[in-house]
Swiss-Prot record:
NCBIfam families: PRK13625.1. Its cofactor is Ni(2+). HAMAP family: PrpE. It catalyses: P(1),P(4)-bis(5'-guanosyl) tetraphosphate + H2O = GMP + GTP + 2 H(+). It comes from the Bacteria. It comes from Bacillus mycoides (strain KBAB4). This is Bis(5'-nucleosyl)-tetraphosphatase PrpE [asymmetrical]. Signal peptide: none annotated. Asymmetrically hydrolyzes Ap4p to yield AMP and ATP. Keywords: Hydrolase, Nickel.
Length: 246
């Protein structure tokens, strides 16, 4: 099986449509389908900050749950939206407010449909995907070699948030260590979470979050070819979001 792994979309539907078209997918049926039987995989954070979060929920639900023709690994924004839909006490900020505004603008019956679709998508998707006979792992913020195969709380925190130190940047965002430099495994780890100006290959890891929602690009990785394909963002560039990893 060949895969096209998509970086953090954050509600940027137009960029997603442009990228999948560039990757050879047809939208004739209203969702991206590849005639060469390639499958999409998502590194999470499909919602928040961008203009079309609910559209992305519907598309990813259709591909992953209804058609079982794609893979989705939830991100930290997905986790927070899931908790919001469960009625938990979450702070509606850091991008969640845009998704909530879209959601609250819907009539109640459509709200229920979106809520049920996302809860199902989240609950039926693993923390990370191990694909291609264990040669490929798709996850949100990365994973250490010795964590692969585990599902405990420590691993969940790492996969959703990265190798956080507990310290904060001046803007309140967490300081993260560069775990990829220490990775010695043969399995390819494809992830996102931390915006970079260009896809970042370090050892057998690739960060494909090129900051579409911050005016960068939306990037996909063709696997096993290990070729990156990007489309430009239509949103304003926010340079401070593209900081060094550590």
């Amino acid at each position: 099986m060949k895969y096209d792994i998509i970086g953090d979309i954050h509600g940027c539907f137009q960029e997603f449509q442009d990228l999948t078209t560039k990757l050879g997918y047809s939208w004739d049926s209203g969702i991206p389908i590849h005639n060469a039987k390639r499958r999409l995989a998502f590194v999470g954070d499909i919602t928040d900050r961008g203009p079309h979060s609910l559209r992305m929920i519907e598309i990813v639900w259709e591909l992953v749950i209804n058609r079982k023709d794609a893979y989705y690994a939830p991100g930290n924004h997905c986790n927070k939206l899931y908790r919001f839909f469960l009625g938990r006490n979450v702070t509606i900020a850091h991008g969640l407010e845009t998704t909530v505004a879209e959601y609250e603008a819907l009539p109640s019956n459509k709200q229920q449909i979106i809520k049920e679709k996302f809860i199902t998508l989240y609950e039926q998707s693993p923390l990370y995907h191990i694909l291609d006979e264990k040669n490929l792992t798709v996850c949100h913020a990365g994973i250490r070699q010795d964590y692969i195969g585990r599902q405990d709380k420590k691993v969940q925190t790492f996969v959703l948030y990265g190798d956080i130190t507990g310290e904060k940047h001046p803007d309140g965002s967490p300081v993260r260590q560069d775990w990829a430099k220490e990775y010695k495994g043969e399995t390819w780890i494809v992830y996102g979470h931390t915006p970079v100006n260009e896809p970042r290959f370090v050892n057998h890891t690739v960060n494909i979050d090129t900051g579409a929602v911050f005016g960068g690009k939306l990037t996909g990785l063709r696997y096993p070819e290990l070729e990156t394909v990007s489309v430009p963002s239509s949103l304003p560039f926010v340079p401070e979001k593209f900081r060094p990893i550590s």
